[in-house]
Amino acid sequence: MRSTLAVTTALTLLLGIGVAEAADPTMLAQTAGFLLGNAHRCGVPDERVERAGKVIHDMIVAAAYDPSEAAAAGSRFDEMFLASAFPNQDPDALIPSCLVVVAQFHRLERHHQQADMN
């Protein structure tokens, strides 16, 4: 039951990246940090994770009302990235399958390429 809940929650978070409101840089930062941190954990090359991170950072700055909101969202991104990239061994920790993570990361990259954001 615990693994089903974890997978369902992970899928909801990962798929939710396309639903993040443009006016909510913190939600964008949180969701992207979760995805990119897990992509790093799952062995996606650093260059690709960094490229996606730069695009996300630019989106956060564009969506923020002012520099302090952008800085707060940037901090949230960092927190989520680190927590996802280097999860502790807590049996209740949300650690999504690398198969799901890599598929969602590829989806994000395709979206960025189609939108000419890279």
Predicted regions and their residues:
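Positively charged n-region of N-terminal signal peptides that target proteins for export
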Residues: 1-4
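Bacterial N-terminal signal peptides
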Residues: 6-16
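Generic anion/oxyanion-binding catalytic loop in active/binding sites
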Residues: 11, 24, 87
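Sec/Tat signal peptide C-region and signal peptidase I cleavage site
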Residues: 17-22
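Short N-terminal segments immediately surrounding and downstream of signal-peptide cleavage
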Residues: 23-40
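Compact alpha-helical subdomains of small soluble proteins
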Residues: 46, 50-118
